[in-house]
Amino acid sequence: MTNQPLTLAEKVWRDHIVAAGENGGPDLLYIDLHLVHEVTSPQAFDGLRQAGRKVRRPDLTIATEDHNVPTIGVKTGDLQEIQEPTSRLQVSTLRDNAKEFGIRLHSMGDIEQGIVHTVGPQLGLTQPGMTVVCGDSHTSTHGAFGSIAMGIGTSEVEHVLATQTLPLKPFKTMAIEVSGELQPDVTSKDLILAIIAKIGTGGGQGHIIEYRGEAIEKLSMEARMTMCNMSIEAGARAGMIAPDQVTFDYLEGRPHAPKGADWDAAVEYWKSLRTDDDAQFDTVVHIDGSALTPFVTWGTNPGQGLPLAEAIPQLEDFTNDNDRLAAERAMEYMDLQPGTPLRDIKIDTVFLGSCTNSRIEDLRAAADVLKGRTVADGTRMIVVPSSTRVKMQAEEEGLDQIFIDAGAEWRTAGCSMCLGMNPDQLAPGERSASTSNRNFEGRQGKGGRTHLVSPPVAAATAVTGHLAGPADL
């Protein structure tokens, strides 16, 4: 086994097998980090309670309040700041469960509070070679560090809480090779949207994707997190990028990163986490990164996307009957006509936020476009940092004032308008340009229409009132 060439995913998987599966059964994997939030955990804790079990490794479990929290009016973190009764109950329940089971919790008002997929990396909890799980599909974000990170269901959350293990069958492996160098106006969000448009929302089904190549190696850690975050939108179980000096520089000095001799030993191990030269992937996809331009979605799934310079496709462009029917339904829901230039689509609300694109680099990129400009009449812009730490850093850099001066709303940290589960929602028929990850029907509010975009495109769109890129200003 040790002499067989392995992919990155296979190496991490191998190092976490507690008990190998027999006769095609699942392997039992050890879980290094379990992230918890208020929405998918209540029933899991109830299951523990009913069975008389404790949390096996509370030291490897961390909880945050993110999905249901408001982004306006949060001052102390008191439960009464949550107006919606169900949301307030879920947050209250998480606080009670964390206290009862001895789990570290970052609540509203806590300096470390934020979206769980930002909090893990910024604290240095997410590290190369780990297995990371959370009851949230965008756990794949953490794969940017060279970890196997995946979303799990509530019953699996209970299993990990009780045993710190998870039974899983090995997944297929896919390499997405991105050659060349991205153009200055092209971001990792444009790249991942282009990839999903190419392979489809089911293209990665049953696979762990490893993003490789020159364009990937030149991405910052935050840009890599955006890539891995949206792996699930291509149908993949997880996404990974091999750790390198960019990874090590990001982690060094963070609160939970190894220190001293432990750091040196960790880096030596992390350097081994690369796909062997002769390792075989089940699927390989090639992308020319240098040929990409800003990319946006027009439909109701992340695979229905096009370069910003293009127009809504003609129905006859779809040779597959299912794709054509899906496109027809998407155009009807989105109230769009074939042949309409994407730049002609008027936008009511611009949302800069979510675990995909509201880290400090994203806020800087949008602020660079907005500086000295104003949000168009008839358009509103909401800016929601992904964590309290990100918010504080942005304010130290004066980014908040750039947004406020432009006429945008500067909010506190949370998942916000990414999903219709808190007060930040679209009205029926309202159209958004959003830096989030899903454009499903009703995702941002019943009847809301969502176009997925990068932070620079979001900012340019806010200024013009229609889909636009910085080059259009």
Swiss-Prot record:
What the protein does?
Answer: Catalyzes the isomerization between 2-isopropylmalate and 3-isopropylmalate, via the formation of 2-isopropylmaleate.
Q: Which InterPro entries match?
A: 3-IsopropMal_deHydase_lsu, Acnase/IPM_dHydase_lsu_aba_1/3, Acoase/IPM_deHydtase_lsu_aba, Aconitase_4Fe-4S_BS, Aconitase_4Fe-4S_dom, IPM_dehydratase_rel_enz, IPMI_cat
Q: Which family does it belong to?
A: Belongs to the aconitase/IPM isomerase family. LeuC type 1 subfamily.
Q: Name one GO biological process term.
A: L-leucine biosynthetic process
Name used for this protein in its record:
3-isopropylmalate dehydratase large subunit
Q: How is the cofactor bound?
A: Binds 1 [4Fe-4S] cluster per subunit.
Please name the GO terms that the record assigns under molecular function.
3-isopropylmalate dehydratase activity; 4 iron, 4 sulfur cluster binding; metal ion binding
Q: Please name one Pfam family that this protein belongs to.
A: Aconitase
Q: In which pathway does it act?
A: Amino-acid biosynthesis; L-leucine biosynthesis; L-leucine from 3-methyl-2-oxobutanoate: step 2/4
What interactions and quaternary structure are annotated? Heterodimer of LeuC and LeuD.
Q: Which PROSITE patterns match?
A: ACONITASE_1 (PS00450), ACONITASE_2 (PS01244)
| Organism expressing this protein natively | Corynebacterium jeikeium (strain K411)
